[in-house]
């Protein structure tokens, strides 16, 4: 029989009992001034944070690995762990150790996860931090994706009958955590990047009945109609999962969330994650942020709220002319007046993150420093307002042909001023209450100014003037009692006392109480001395306790102002967003585009804003571009490195900027509003999921062909290059034909290709128009002119580009020989007008190594009339077809073909 293990200490028993409830989190266990971690948690944390790993003995036989971090610096350590994808459970002492009988009671007060943090140390100031939830109802063939930023209280979502569309939005919004019902797998097509998937029980988190109650309770409504959730049970379930997870991690029901706003796709230009990546809106193609992205060019915001609004507008530009033109009016008004704009920037620079400050205050997670930041922000509001009310300065204006002059306030700004709230009452309260440099922790005291609270003033006076009070009492007793030789003393045993010589002790008044007799002296106390002593000894503790109570009261009062603070935060965010667009336009010489509801796109001297910023405006070559009913698909040819991809990207970016309401990098621009922008540019693969570069290219092309409409803008770069020459050319040719047939006249498309044979489609298919990037041959070299000119390119100059890239001379020379032979073969075949010939390449004469090349011939023209079955097959979306729907469609197709069972019998 084995001996039982020695009993664990009470502390370790408590630790293990709490840890059992949080097996997937690192448990930060509060012990005095430190958070300690034990066992596997300690080893993991020590490794990830590069801190010392020690050990502690839970009993006589066991040694437990241990590490710890000081409580006053814990935020920085937790931030590192969250960035690495860990969850952290914070276990606090929930009773005062001085009053505890035995082991101090402890409990987990919150669980920190990447998608639920609200502290600045764990957040990027100008980026949203989303928690997402995706739910698909297989029976109803419908689903939803919802997301929330806990730090600001904003949340939204969308309902769809296409599962693929929901996953596209999950990729686009890139939540830090994505909640999925247990048993649901991530599809192979989804590339979630840094998003962590979290499986949660469907019954508890995604349940419709309890979820409906949870959503209505959190939003304070009696029905779902006011939230836009009526008749969308799948979206209700996704929202409910978010709320359940937040309650589970935050250990409280969150009531700070703003009213839920479903995303109205009909109001916004849709840009999927692939297009955002290809256009390098937020990240470069190598995944890094900063220089090389459109965000880096546009971000001249000064407040975190303005930065996040800029991010939102880049994700979701407008599709309606009204909001676009309103934004343009304000941007132009600020663009005109440099003095006003700089004054506005100076005032906005004093404003902190009002949204996140308000959230932390409301959730009782704010530090004294947060209140100081709020005070400074509110104090800046009058200065911001004054910049809008001041008359225009003629010396600082920039003349334009604007519809708004410097003295005419655009309607969005006049509406803003009419509703402006300086929050002067709360700014005054915070000025009167708090010192300029309060401590970081509420429990340390020293928070409040003198004069804010009479009781606190008395305690502060005692702490500061206690010795003087004692001397005043001594002088009073000396005078009133007639004891001029009376002295005041102190020791740790008796505290404060009066002392007289043995000879003078006989004449003390009756209110003197003897405390101690010495050889040559007597020591006394009085009621007043005891009262003063008690006040002095307890003044520090009483002051800290009172200040903590006053701070909580102040927090509750300021929390009531959250709706007003958020209202002004939204105003400041828009002002910051508008001035940022104006400042960027002024600095870079951008112009206000004409945005209309037609389909034409006309750009004069357009530029790529990112490339121009990196190269310098002097060396960047601008280009003109026109798309209309006769030029709906532009075939762009030219050599590598000539600038085809730049032209494609800059056109898409100019359209995106225009629909944000921003100015654009061009001399002049007229943009027909698009409903979606699609981009298939550059090579990429997904090897982890078994998808080659060509497979990814075809999947993205398929999505474009399924989803693009007549109002869409499509940019395609070198479709078909990842396979054999003829396969690739055939695919590219077929894609061009399909794009010109779609949507009753074709889809607006920029199509860059090296398959020069496709340029023969101009004149054969309406709407196809050839353009090329011009080059010049000079003394055996090629000079890239970077100019987009009419007509097709005569050749690709790939060998010359290879030579410029440093490919060895022998390889370049051999390539020239092979090219010359291939061209002779092609020309001979065309000259004899015979059947396609085959020619063995020179130098490859071994039978087993022969490569044969067919002469390129134009494919047959497509028939003017398609069979109805072909039309039905082409338009079907197999990704979202159910088995029942498939059977129904097959029956329809058989009828179209004329081979029903009845016909065969």
UniProtKB/Swiss-Prot annotation:
Keyword tags: ATP-binding, DNA damage, DNA repair, DNA-binding, Nucleotide-binding
Disordered: annotated span: 388-410, 826-847
Matching Gene3D superfamilies: 1.10.1420.10, DNA repair protein MutS, domain I (3.40.1170.10), MutS, connector domain (3.30.420.110), P-loop containing nucleotide triphosphate hydrolases (3.40.50.300)
A GO molecular function held by the record: damaged DNA binding
Biased composition (Polar residues): 831-840
GO biological process, one term: mismatch repair
Pfam families cross-referenced by the UniProt entry: MutS_I (PF01624), MutS_II (PF05188), MutS_III (PF05192), MutS_IV (PF05190), MutS_V (PF00488)
InterPro entries the record matches: DNA_mismatch_repair_MutS, DNA_mismatch_repair_MutS-lik_N, DNA_mismatch_repair_MutS/MSH, DNA_mismatch_repair_MutS_C, DNA_mismatch_repair_MutS_clamp, DNA_mismatch_repair_MutS_core, DNA_mismatch_repair_MutS_N, DNA_mismatch_repair_MutS_sf
GO cellular component, one term: cytosol
Family statement: Belongs to the DNA mismatch repair MutS family.
Function of the molecule: This protein is involved in the repair of mismatches in DNA. It is possible that it carries out the mismatch recognition step. This protein has a weak ATPase activity.
NCBIfam families per record: mutS1, PRK05399.1
Protein name per Swiss-Prot or TrEMBL: DNA mismatch repair protein MutS
Organism: Nitratidesulfovibrio vulgaris (strain DP4) (Desulfovibrio vulgaris)
Organism placement in taxonomy: Bacteria, Pseudomonadati, Thermodesulfobacteriota, Desulfovibrionia, Desulfovibrionales
Protein encoded by which gene: mutS
């Amino acid at each position: 029989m084995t001996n039982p293990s020695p009993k664990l200490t009470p502390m370790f028993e408590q630790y293990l009992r709490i840890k059992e409830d949080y097996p997937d989190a690192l448990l930060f266990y509060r012990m005095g001034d430190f958070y300690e971690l034990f066992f596997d948690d300690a080893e993991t944390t020590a490794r990830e944070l590069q801190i010392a790993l020690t050990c502690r003995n839970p009993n006589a036989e066991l040694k437990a690995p241990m590490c710890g971090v000081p409580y006053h610096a814990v935020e920085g350590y937790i931030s590192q762990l969250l960035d690495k994808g860990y969850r952290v459970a914070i276990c606090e002492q929930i009773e005062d150790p001085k009053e505890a009988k035995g082991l101090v009671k402890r409990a987990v007060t919150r669980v920190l996860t990447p998608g639920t943090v609200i502290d600045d140390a764990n957040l990027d100031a100008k980026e949203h931090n989303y928690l997402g939830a995706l739910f698909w109802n297989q029976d109803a063939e419908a689903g939803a994706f919802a997301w929330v930023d806990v730090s600001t209280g904003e949340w939204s979502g969308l309902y769809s009958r296409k599962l693929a569309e929901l996953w596209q939005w999950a990729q686009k919004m890139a939540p830090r955590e994505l909640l999925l019902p247990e048993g649901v797998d991530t599809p192979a097509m989804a590339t979630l990047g840094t998003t962590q998937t979290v499986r949660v029980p469907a019954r508890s988190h995604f349940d419709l009945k309890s979820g409906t109650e949870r959503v209505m309770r959190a939003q304070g409504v009696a029905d779902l109609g006011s939230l836009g959730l009526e008749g969308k049970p799948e979206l209700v379930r996704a929202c409910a999962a978010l709320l359940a997870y937040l309650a589970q991690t935050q250990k409280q029901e969150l009531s700070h969330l703003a009213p839920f706003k479903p995303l109205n796709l009909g109001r916004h230009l849709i840009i999927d994650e692939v297009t955002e990546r290809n256009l390098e809106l937020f990240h470069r193609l190598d995944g890094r942020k900063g220089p090389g992205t459109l965000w880096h060019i546009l971000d001249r915001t000064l407040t975190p709220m303005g930065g996040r609004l800029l991010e939102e507008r880049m994700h979701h530009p407008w599709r309606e002319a009204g909001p676009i033109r309103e934004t343009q009016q304000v941007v132009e008004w600020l663009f005109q007046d440099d003095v006003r704009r700089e004054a506005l920037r100076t005032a906005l620079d004093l404003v902190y993150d009002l949204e996140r400050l308000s959230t932390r205050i409301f959730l009782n997670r704010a530090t004294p420093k947060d209140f100081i930041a709020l005070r400074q922000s509110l104090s800046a509001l009058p200065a911001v307002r004054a910049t809008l009310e001041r008359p225009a300065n003629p010396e600082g204006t920039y003349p334009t042909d604007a519809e708004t002059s410097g003295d005419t306030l655009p309607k969005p700004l006049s509406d803003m001023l009419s509703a402006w709230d300086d929050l002067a009452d709360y700014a005054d309260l915070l000025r009167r209450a708090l010192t300029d440099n309060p401590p970081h922790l509420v429990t340390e005291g020293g928070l409040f100014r003198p004069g804010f609270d009479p009781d606190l003033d008395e305690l502060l006076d005692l702490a500061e003037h206690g010795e003087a009070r004692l001397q005043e009492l001594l002088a009073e007793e000396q005078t009133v009692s007639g004891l001029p030789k009376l002295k005041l003393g102190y020791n740790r045993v008796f505290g404060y006392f009066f002392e007289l010589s043995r000879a003078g002790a006989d004449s003390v008044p009756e209110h003197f109480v003897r405390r101690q007799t010495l050889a040559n002296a007597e020591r006394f106390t009085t009621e007043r001395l005891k009262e003063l002593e008690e006040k002095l000894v307890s003044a520090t503790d009483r002051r800290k306790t009172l200040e903590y109570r006053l701070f909580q009261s102040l927090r509750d009062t300021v929390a009531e102002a959250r709706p007003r603070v958020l209202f002004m935060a939204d105003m400041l965010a828009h002002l910051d967003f508008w001035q940022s667009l104006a400042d960027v336009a002024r600095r870079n010489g951008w112009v206000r585009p004409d945005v209309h509801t037609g389909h034409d796109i006309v750009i004069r001297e357009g530029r790529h804003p990112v490339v121009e910023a990196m190269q310098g405006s002097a060396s960047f070559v601008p280009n003109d571009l026109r798309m209309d009913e006769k030029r709906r698909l532009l075939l762009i040819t030219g050599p590598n490195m000539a600038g085809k991809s730049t032209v494609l990207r800059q056109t898409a970016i100019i359209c995106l900027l225009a629909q944000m309401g921003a100015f654009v990098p061009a001399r002049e621009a007229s943009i027909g509003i698009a409903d979606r922008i699609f981009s298939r540019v550059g090579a990429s693969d997904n090897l982890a999921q078994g998808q080659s570069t060509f497979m990814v290219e075809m999947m993205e092309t398929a999505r474009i062909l399924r989803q693009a409409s007549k109002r869409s803008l499509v940019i395609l770069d070198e479709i078909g290059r990842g396979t054999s020459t003829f396969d690739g050319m055939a695919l590219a040719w077929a894609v061009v034909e399909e794009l010109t047939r779609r949507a009753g006249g074709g889809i607006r498309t920029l199509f860059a290709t090296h398959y020069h044979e496709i340029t023969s489609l101009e004149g054969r298919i309406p709407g196809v128009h050839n353009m090329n990037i011009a080059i010049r041959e000079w003394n055996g070299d090629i000079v890239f002119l970077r100019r987009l000119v009419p007509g097709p390119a005569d050749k690709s100059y790939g060998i010359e580009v290879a030579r410029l890239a440093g490919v060895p001379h022998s390889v370049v020379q051999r390539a020239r020989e092979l090219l010359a032979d291939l061209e002779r073969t092609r020309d001979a075949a065309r000259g004899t007008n015979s059947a396609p010939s085959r020619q063995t390449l020179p130098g490859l004469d071994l039978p087993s190594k022969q490569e044969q090349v067919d002469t390129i011939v134009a494919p047959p023209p497509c028939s003017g009339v398609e069979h109805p079955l072909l039309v039905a097959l082409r338009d079907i979306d197999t990704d979202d077809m159910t088995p029942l729907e498939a059977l129904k469609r097959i029956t329809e197709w058989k009828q179209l073909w004329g081979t029903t069972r009845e016909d065969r019998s």
